[in-house]
Amino acid sequence: MKPLNIIFAGTPDFAARHLQALLDSEHNVIAVYSQPDRPAGRGKKLSASPVKELALSHDIPVFQPASLRAVEAQAELATLNADIMVVVAYGLILPQIVLDTPRLGCINVHGSILPRWRGAAPIQRALWAGDTETGVTIMQMDLGLDTGDMLLKTSLPIEDADTSASLYEKLAVQGPQALLEALDGLNAGKLKGEPQDPALANYAEKLSKEEARLDWNKSAKQLWQEIRAFNPWPVSYFEYQDSTIKVWQASYNPQPNSALAGSIIKADKHSIEVATAEGSLQLEIIQLPNKKPLAVADILNSRADWFAQGLSLLPEASS
């Protein structure tokens, strides 16, 4: 089979992993699209995206239009005569004229098993909801938000130790493999799109810092899911002793207890156990303001008085 001439569109590191897989394949990446350089770091200097940096290191032309709605940008893309456009976490909307420009259209790598978790935060929402598996979907793009026909799906189990950070790494390996398999299938004319069932679809909303505040009136299992979903960002937290305390790692005990939600059942070298609406949450790695995340055993060496049995972590109790 003749190698495909590919336009790649993406911006963050997750996308760069997919671009690298294409560069290592027999296919030809003829151009790269990435979002305009953004101010980053303390000096707020303009910074190129990981995708742009990778493309430039391989002498691939990079295009950074602020929008693909402009006629000039659309005409420029058409002159590239691509067979297909691969889109991974690009961040710009593709109008219909762009979707129709490459011979095989535009395909997208999405970090969930569609139609579940369409939208911006599929990896995090799978953890947040307590899903037992996630995966990658390669889909033919249309004008909707992750609504296109599914070309290929892969899955992997979500383990108890998984966080958004670890799932991100796993999908950053699985995604490029699925992408190459889908490209080979499309190139051979053997891959047929499967329409999504709208009745099975739901939406993965972006995370917010406010959402990461731990609510002791939820179940311990739900809080455990949130802590894993919000690691590495925005990181679950609670307000206590006029401080914002972040929780990086926890486990939970589903057994009922008689303690009030938010009160400390016990604190030892293994964890700080806090009562919730259902069961108890065992805090294992936490972070005090302007400090590094530490195991609870190290925190208790200097702050045992904060976490004595019977104290309440509810904001009004510590003010």
UniProtKB/Swiss-Prot annotation:
Q: Gene3D superfamilies, per this entry?
A: Formyl transferase, C-terminal domain, Formyl transferase, N-terminal domain
Please give the Gene Ontology molecular function terms for this protein.
Answer: methionyl-tRNA formyltransferase activity
Can you state which reaction this protein catalyses? L-methionyl-tRNA(fMet) + (6R)-10-formyltetrahydrofolate = N-formyl-L-methionyl-tRNA(fMet) + (6S)-5,6,7,8-tetrahydrofolate + H(+)
Q: Does the keyword Methyltransferase apply?
A: no
Q: Which InterPro entries match?
A: Fmt, Formyl_trans_C, Formyl_trans_C_sf, Formyl_transf_N, Formyl_transf_N_sf, Formyl_transferase-like_C_sf, Met-tRNA-FMT_C, Met-tRNA-FMT_N
Top-rank taxon of the source lineage equals Bacteria
**Keyword Transport annotated:** no
Q: What class of enzyme is it?
A: transferase
Q: What is its EC number?
A: 2.1.2.9
UniProt keyword annotations, A-Z: Protein biosynthesis, Transferase
GO-annotated cellular components: cytosol
- Name a Pfam family for this protein: Formyl_trans_C
Q: Which residues bind (6S)-5,6,7,8-tetrahydrofolate per the record?
A: S112, I113, L114, P115
Q: Which HAMAP family match?
A: Formyl_trans
Q: Which NCBIfam families match?
A: fmt
Function, please? Attaches a formyl group to the free amino group of methionyl-tRNA(fMet). The formyl group appears to play a dual role in the initiator identity of N-formylmethionyl-tRNA by promoting its recognition by IF2 and preventing the misappropriation of this tRNA by the elongation apparatus.
Report the sequence similarity comment from the record: Belongs to the Fmt family.
- What is the protein name for this chain? Methionyl-tRNA formyltransferase
User: Which species is this UniProt entry from?
Assistant: Shewanella denitrificans (strain OS217 / ATCC BAA-1090 / DSM 15013)
